[in-house]
Design a protein with these regions (language model features):
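…and closely analogous acidic/polar surface helices at protein-protein or active-site interfaces
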Residues: 54, 162-194, 201-203, 217-220, ...
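VWA/integrin I-like adhesion module and closely mimicked acidic/polar interface patches used
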Residues: 337-344, 353-416
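N-terminal signal-anchor/signal peptide hydrophobic helix marking the start
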Residues: 24-35
């Protein structure tokens, strides 16, 4: 390109010199007319380059203006919005040669919140005025969109006995409340963000008021909670009244070893078989009841306040019930999704230790890899893989204050359908104070604004 341009300019210079020496007839006039297109082309290149620089500066100012307007757009009138847009833009756009600057901003909430800022200006020319173009018009547009993707976030929170040490439960409560505030602030309208909370230990609590529900299997509970009297032919047992149940359920599947059953690894609704139903258990370390998807932020905070550390660790049941809270079933109802929006379904699983007991394995004190296998196996089976394959993204957090080995189980569980193993979604902290930082980091990644174009 440079060689061609030099060839043209050299050729033009030689011919121009010849024209200047030639005094015959109208050669001088012809020369002047002939040079006009050349001057115009050179002038256009210079002026166009200058205008492009102004346009780039204008676009950068529009992008920043759109982002800054997004913070308060929902509370401003259209007049105030445009006044604020002009103030932001003028503070950012430092090109005094630009004239007739015009800025227009609009805010809409259909299918999510969106700010659109359009701008234009004229740039005086240096050379093109010779051929009648005294200025060039430049323009741009920037869109900041948020809320076009709605969030549904399930929090599976470890409420086991070990959370009582090192200030972990206190830190978890504080971090969870801060995360709830982040998520609340990300919602411009009700329904933009739903959150569920699943406190877990060995069991989860689905609410004792559901004792008449047809999705509960009472077989083991009736056997374990009965009053027996007499002897011989006169020996008889009477099951306790089910209204004395404390609300806890354990892993789905057969009473004995699960074998090939995978009911504990899916969110499929129960059928009429006992193995598919959720088995009641009078667990003496029953955690606070789960809270299904809601944007009742006060109710969610009340659940957090009620959490107490007690019991053994069964991460698989916390994880599968977090999933259940996103799809519904049992005591949980899920609001319909609006086709005008995209949705991101998220699970955040936080635990401070390794698995110690489920319905079939472990004693609550020692680590049980048999419990781990219900959640993840190297062959790709287990609850983690099932959840990610369904389109739900999993974040996992290991609060390791006891110097345990890093939880490869939680590390392998983190990910999404697009990236089944994603270490960027696994976090490990070695002190209770680290919980807040991780929750904040995850909350920020879920709620950040984006410039759409």
């Amino acid at each position: 390109m440079k060689t061609m341009w030099k060839h043209l300019t050299d050729s033009f210079a030689r011919k121009a010199a010849a024209f200047r020496r030639d005094r015959r007839g109208n050669v001088a006039i012809t020369f002047a007319i002939a040079t006009l297109p050349i001057v115009g082309a050179v002038g256009y290149a210079v002026d166009y380059s200058h205008a492009n620089n102004v346009k780039a500066a204008l676009q950068a100012a529009l992008d920043s203006t759109a982002l800054m307007l997004a913070r308060d757009a929902s509370s401003m009138s259209n007049t105030d919005l445009n006044a604020k847009a002009l103030n932001y833009f003028n503070a950012l756009f430092n090109r005094p040669e630009a004239k007739n600057v015009s800025i227009n901003a609009s805010y809409t909430t259909s299918g999510g919140s969106k700010i659109v800022v359009n701008g234009s200006a004229t740039v005086p020319t240096t050379f093109l005025g010779i051929i009648g173009y005294n200025d060039l018009t430049v323009g741009g547009s920037s869109t900041t969109a948020w809320g076009s993707t709605r969030l549904r976030v399930a929090l599976a929170l470890d409420n086991t006995g070990s959370m009582a040490s090192d200030g972990k439960m206190t830190a978890l409560k504080s971090a969870t409340k801060s995360l709830l505030t982040q998520l609340k602030n990300a919602a411009s309208t009700n329904g933009d963000v739903y959150v569920s909370i699943v406190p877990f230990a060995k069991d989860v609590n689905v609410g004792s008021s559901n004792y008449n529900a047809n999705w509960i299997d009472w077989t083991d509970w009736d056997n374990d909670n009965q009053y027996c009297s007499g002897w011989g032919w006169y020996y008889s047992c009477t099951p306790a009244n089910r209204n004395t149940w404390n609300g806890c359920i354990t892993d789905r599947g057969p009473s004995g070893a699960p074998g090939t059953s995978t009911w504990d690894q899916v969110a499929t609704l129960p059928n009429n078989t006992a193995i598919s139903k959720w088995p009641a258990e009078q667990y003496n370390a029953c955690p606070v009841a789960i809270k299904g998807l809601t944007y009742d932020w006060s109710a969610l905070n009340n659940v957090v306040d009620s959490m107490q550390p007690n019991g053994a660790t069964n991460q698989p049941i916390g994880l599968v019930w977090a999933w259940q809270s996103l799809v519904g079933g049992g005591p949980l109802t899920v609001p319909a999704k609006d086709s005008n929006y995209e949705y991101s379904d998220i699970i955040i699983l936080m635990s401070d230790g390794l698995n110690t007991q489920d319905r079939w394995y472990g004693n609550g004190s020692n680590t049980s890899t048999a419990v781990d296998y219900r959640m993840y196996q190297t062959n790709g089976s287990g609850t983690c893989a099932n959840i990610k394959a369904s389109g739900v993204t999993i974040y996992t957090i290991h609060v390791n204050t006891d110097g345990d080995p890093t939880s490869t189980l939680l590390q392998n569980c983190a990910g999404s359908k697009d990236k089944m193993y994603d270490v960027s979604k696994f976090f490990t902290v070695t002190s209770a104070s680290g919980i807040a930082k991780v929750f904040n980091e995850i909350g920020t990644s879920l709620t950040q604004l984006r410039v759409a174009k």
